[in-house]
Amino acid sequence: MLFELPGEVNNPNANVIKAVEKLKKQEPAPLSVKAKATFIQPANYDQHLEWLKDCDLVIEAIAERMDWKRDLYTKIAPYLGEHTIFASNTSGLSINQLAEAFPEALRHRFCGIHFFNPPRYMHLVELIPCQASDADMLDDLEAFLVTYLGKGVIRAKDTPNFIANRIGVFSLLATMHHGRAFDFGFDLVDALTGALIGRPKSATFRTADVVGLDTLAHVINTMRDTLPDDAWHAHFAVPESGAFVAALRS
């Protein structure tokens, strides 16, 4: 089941149907078999919230905005089943602050579950509990991720950007900083920071593109807003490169 914002009045599932069709065309392919897209049940927030009560696991993956996520949680909380696990795919927002949007009685079924893009191919998943997360629930969720999805799970603390993005985005920003200092272009930076030094061939700027420039900007802003004492705080900013900013806004 996939939820989206409702479309026009005469076709409220238009947005979610468009999203499912897009899955068939994306590269690298997010589905192992394109025909399996028919297994996805389209849903929208106006008509189908009652369906949530029958779900064992609900994963939220909307934009990296604390206010948007908390508003959504407030809206859907009354419709969650007694045993439903609700998890956020946030890239680095505070899980405890997100949990505050739920009634206290539901917080033990909430946690962070951070997949990496593209999720079909990236092995790592971070599992981040809030203070109220039930230990057995976390164990069950990890078992599902490992056994049925074939993922490698790491438990992370509720710190800014968790583990992977805290290290990885710092690495990207440091590389971009030094690239600018030497007046290196995008292609040269990626040539020097990819397979040549044992890193993924996506290197630096290609990795930023795969992550999603909008998502990357939100992750950088989280570091800027929550790590004021970090030695590199001055560099926690979206690069001012004209080409980068143009790509970000396109």
Where are these regions (language model features)?
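N-terminal glycine-rich phosphate-binding loop for ADP-containing cofactors
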Residues: 1-250
